[in-house]
Design a protein with these regions (language model features):
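Short, well-ordered loop/turn elements at secondary-structure boundaries
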Residues: 146-148, 196-197
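N-terminal amphipathic/basic-hydrophobic helices that include classical n-h-c signal peptides
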Residues: 1-21
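Short hydrophobic beta-strand that contains or immediately precedes a catalytic carboxylate
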Residues: 151-155
Length: 331
């Protein structure tokens, strides 16, 4: 957003120098992060939460000594105000953010949480401010990953990769970003055994995980490291579907669940037991029970957990029938 934008009610009408340039649905969603040293992140929490509540913003923001990360949603005016507030924080003038739009609010409440890391890798010596891989804009990404000398790595979790990834990408098959360093070390050892020193290109949803994964690769002595600037979301926003090398949809951590090219809402729902994406085919499985379990987590749940999920689902169904929202929702 820019200071000279103007808004109308309903669909948001953007004007720059009096010229209408686009219209969007009424809910603006901002995915943002910035690595910067905060001496006392706890001191920033109260004013940030107050500003978000004042502007009707919902979502989650994480604060740590290494910076800020999160996804928030609200009116375009409200998001513009909060982005300005965050950019006024120490070292946040170069805040990275991406906008998308929806007809419905994808979050139930506003949370500002204090964390050890804004994205958890479990490698305290890795500092993206000390050096990361080379950023590759979305417009140049296809050429890089089409090069046979490039090894393409998806740094996301297994359930994210399952709904979509780039053609030819390696899936580390990890359940947590904490597992990535060990996987990478093993993969690098295998490449060295083959006598290969390829270019390594990495990608993730919005770019933040690659700040750490490429910094980690550099710390391991890998020299030719690249990552997709703005992540998958920027690629899906900027690259026409006819030219795209992306296959499937992109998982996002809010009630939209997935998005497609143009950042249009995808076709997946969310399992409220395990928080994994659920496809239309998954719902035909006898293991799927709405709000209680899906095929991916059916074997992981106890009868006590299922009973608790069933009670929660009953409350949500009652709230929906009344036309209200059940405050016990997770997002």
């Amino acid at each position: 957003l820019r200071p000279d934008l103007r808004y109308a009610t309903g669909n948001v009408i953007f004007k720059v120098s009096g010229t209408v340039i686009m219209s969007q649905p009424p809910v603006c969603i901002a995915a943002l992060y910035r690595f910067t040293p905060f001496a006392d992140p706890a001191a920033l929490r109260a004013s940030l939460l107050e500003a978000c509540l004042q502007h009707g913003i919902r979502g989650t923001l994480l604060l740590a000594r290494e910076g800020i990360n999160g996804t928030i949603a609200g009116s375009a005016e409200g998001i513009e105000s909060i982005l300005a507030h965050i950019r006024s924080l120490p070292g946040c003038d170069a805040l990275e953010w991406k906008l998308s739009w929806d007809d419905a609010m994808p979050f139930n409440r506003m949370k500002v949480r204090l964390k050890r890391e804004i994205v958890t890798m479990g490698q305290p010596d890795i500092d993206p401010l000390a050096g990361v891989g080379r950023y590759v804009p979305a417009a140049e990404w296809n050429a890089l990953i089409s090069d046979p000398d490039t090894i393409l790595i998806d740094t996301r979790n297994d359930y994210e990769v399952a709904v979509g990834t780039f053609k030819g990408a390696i899936d580390p098959d990890i359940q947590s970003f904490r597992e990535f360093p060990d996987w990478f070390r093993a993969r690098r050892a295998a490449l060295e055994a083959e006598g290969r020193k390829p270019k390594i290109a990495m990608f993730c949803t919005g770019g933040i995980r690659c700040e750490k994964s490429t910094a980690f690769a550099l710390s391991e002595g890998v020299e030719d490291v690249y990552h997709l600037k703005g992540g998958i979301l920027k690629y899906l926003e900027d690259v026409p579907e006819a030219e795209s090398l992306w296959e499937g949809e992109c998982f996002v951590f809010d009630q939209r669940v997935t998005v497609r090219h143009g950042l249009e809402p995808g076709a997946y729902d969310l399992c409220h037991a395990c928080r994994r994406p659920v496809s239309a085919q998954d719902k035909t499985s006898p293991l799927f029970i709405d709000g209680i379990q899906c095929p991916a987590c059916a074997a992981e749940r106890t009868d006590e957990q299922r009973a608790r999920y069933a009670a929660r689902q009953h409350q949500e169904d009652l709230a929906r029938a009344r036309g209200t929202h059940h405050i016990g929702g997770d997002a």
